[in-house]
């Protein structure tokens, strides 16, 4: 086994995590190689043809702010965009786009091929080579060794993949591609704990065989949206989605065939995603419901293939055909692909550091579904952080760690490395403690400076960001210092809005704080700036109106940061701390949190246990101070 080539960073996998990892490392100047089992499958969207949505849209915006690629490519290839929860507060509003999955995958491949310092390799990686506790490289199925100072594993659902359709099972990755064989055994030999999860996908139908007149049309928003503030606003023609529903006949058919459903026959052993259940699971769990929503989503401008969201299933193909035809509008639908379930191996995520480096092997990082997550956006976010930190490892630089108070990416990774997950992890807005501070509309304000610090934000992006940031600050200052009195044009607008008239002078900031007053009303009064960029005035309006809530969250953040500042020695013997509960000793010894804050979030570690740890850390600090004085 000879050395073929030496790289700084090797990325295994070219899905959504692998793409971001490879681009991040290469853009930071690392000699990078990205391995995939087939070059034709780079950036494949093997499940739903969409990006974004609640919490997921936040992740996409944060990836963009840090200098990642997903947002830019989504903006370039979308079929439809909608702002979800637009009638609710800004904390839960989220952008969701239907994506042309063919165009998206091709665009991502072009980005990779045109990136300096990045080689693409079609090969099956079977072994991780480790020497003296450090990663040394990888070996392919054909016996070729490639050296590397850091390796990122982003294998998706390919590790020992097994697809199931009714009674038919076969070793396979998603979409019928070859599974990754051998890598799981390599990880186990290195001492990693490996688990098994399951996910699934619905059938696809030929749109020419669907009667859309029996469905409810759902169009994109007429006003243009974008994930990246670097993308132009695009008024392209959008394609509609369609809403229909299952029927009592659908449910009866499923019940009659439960004895053939792998979910209920014991064929499927892996735990599936809670928030994306199969249709047979929904029928059993919600037996009183007469129907469930079904959405038909276009997959590409170049294809008639439609994704049947809501009918994820692993029932036999002949049952799937019959099932689809019980849904209004699809009585004569032709299946182009059957739905299937897929089982795959993953690494138990508590074996990772917050940097996504493994605790067992230095220089080995993991990102994406290999860490037990679900979703393109979750994968891309982890891949980006893993790629940045693989490069930092090579440079000998401190890793980038996003805290829970800085981004949804921080919440995602902290949950994984601190708590783990007994099922495929999905990002939800409810998982974030500081939702008013972590809005999707301020992701660039929160994280672009970090992206610049770590070398992924170029001069063009930085210039646009600085203009936005400075524009927001300048307008906030103007609103705070400008006083307006009860002028007739002001009183007229306030009366029309049903707002109390002014009796004395107030600042524009105080006026904008009124629930019924919007920034455009200030413009109408002659007090706003009609030429101001919409992104600036919208952010200013949000900051002013929610200042009280944001201030309360900031107090919580300050308390959390004090806890995060208390570092725990990596060699601390928890078994020797007699004040800890037995469960806390076991969990702390296994997870080995890096800070007191992380320790406090571990399931089974009580406030009393945290107090014991705090006392011990204080004792260690005093002993260290005395030693230094001596």
UniProtKB/Swiss-Prot annotation:
<keyword id="KW-0285">Flavoprotein</keyword>
<dbReference type="GO" id="GO:0005829">
    <property type="term" value="C:cytosol"/>
</dbReference>
<dbReference type="InterPro" id="IPR049312">
    <property type="entry name" value="GIDA_C_N"/>
</dbReference>
<comment type="subunit">
    <text>Homodimer. Heterotetramer of two MnmE and two MnmG subunits.</text>
</comment>
<comment type="similarity">
    <text>Belongs to the MnmG family.</text>
</comment>
<dbReference type="GO" id="GO:0002098">
    <property type="term" value="P:tRNA wobble uridine modification"/>
</dbReference>
<dbReference type="InterPro" id="IPR026904">
    <property type="entry name" value="MnmG_C"/>
</dbReference>
<keyword id="KW-0520">NAD</keyword>
<dbReference type="InterPro" id="IPR002218">
    <property type="entry name" value="MnmG-rel"/>
</dbReference>
<dbReference type="InterPro" id="IPR004416">
    <property type="entry name" value="MnmG"/>
</dbReference>
<dbReference type="Pfam" id="PF21680">
    <property type="entry name" value="GIDA_C_1st"/>
</dbReference>
<dbReference type="GO" id="GO:0050660">
    <property type="term" value="F:flavin adenine dinucleotide binding"/>
</dbReference>
<keyword id="KW-0819">tRNA processing</keyword>
<feature type="binding site">
    <location>
        <begin position="272"/>
        <end position="286"/>
    </location>
    <ligand>
        <name>NAD(+)</name>
    </ligand>
</feature>
<dbReference type="InterPro" id="IPR020595">
    <property type="entry name" value="MnmG-rel_CS"/>
</dbReference>
<feature type="binding site">
    <location>
        <begin position="13"/>
        <end position="18"/>
    </location>
    <ligand>
        <name>FAD</name>
    </ligand>
</feature>
<comment type="function">
    <text>NAD-binding protein involved in the addition of a carboxymethylaminomethyl (cmnm) group at the wobble position (U34) of certain tRNAs, forming tRNA-cmnm(5)s(2)U34.</text>
</comment>
<dbReference type="Pfam" id="PF01134">
    <property type="entry name" value="GIDA"/>
</dbReference>
<keyword id="KW-0274">FAD</keyword>
<dbReference type="GO" id="GO:0030488">
    <property type="term" value="P:tRNA methylation"/>
</dbReference>
<dbReference type="InterPro" id="IPR040131">
    <property type="entry name" value="MnmG_N"/>
</dbReference>
<dbReference type="InterPro" id="IPR044920">
    <property type="entry name" value="MnmG_C_subdom_sf"/>
</dbReference>
<dbReference type="Pfam" id="PF13932">
    <property type="entry name" value="SAM_GIDA_C"/>
</dbReference>
<dbReference type="InterPro" id="IPR047001">
    <property type="entry name" value="MnmG_C_subdom"/>
</dbReference>
<keyword id="KW-0963">Cytoplasm</keyword>
<dbReference type="InterPro" id="IPR036188">
    <property type="entry name" value="FAD/NAD-bd_sf"/>
</dbReference>
<protein>
    <recommendedName>
        <fullName>tRNA uridine 5-carboxymethylaminomethyl modification enzyme MnmG</fullName>
    </recommendedName>
</protein>
